[in-house]
Amino acid sequence: MRAWIGQVTFINVGYGEAILVEAPDPSCRDDMFVMMIDGGSGEDAEYDGNDTGRIRAAEYLEKRGIRHIDLMVNTHIHEDHTSGLLPVAERWRPGALWQPFPTDMWTEMKPLRMTDEGTIGHQNHGILSTADKFRTALNDYKKLCRLVTECGGQVVQMKPQPAWQPVSSQVRVNILAPDRAVLEQQVDDMR
């Protein structure tokens, strides 16, 4: 077995996830395959104070000098995984977005309105309720899928695979997805 010379970086985005995978690949732009898995939160409150070293995924990629993203993965629709991907996609225009739902589901989704739960008196304190975080994530998911397709990328449904699948000359992935019945119920609930 040959040694892998890529790099995996777990970006400190707080409670969510944001993982950057880089591997040399002469067939990719700049001879580098770049994959972004989840993007952390889009909420300002997650990064306020910055005494914990938390950083927005887009800001981290900018500081690192990342020039492109070949593959973006949204593992599931939660605010602290999905919402941070939107500014990344706006800046780096991924070639593909892998996500767990049917590829056209986002086209059927209606925009969701937020509640006033972050408001005390007449002043909004920027604190989202759990329900509003999920609404935000659903709205951002739809925007993300639209942006990727409008920029020529593909929205792809991840499905369980019997073996490791190559995504570049140096990177293979094994997709572990939810039970088919669970996924179908989630899709029905969101439609």
Report the location of each language-model feature.
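Metallo-beta-lactamase
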Residues: 69-80
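Flexible, acidic/histidine-containing loops and adjacent segments that form or flank the divalent-metal
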Residues: 1-6, 82-191
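Active-site metal-binding loops of divalent metal-dependent hydrolases
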Residues: 13, 38-42, 77, 161, ...
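Sterically constrained small-residue positions within well-ordered secondary structures
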Residues: 12, 28, 78, 164-166
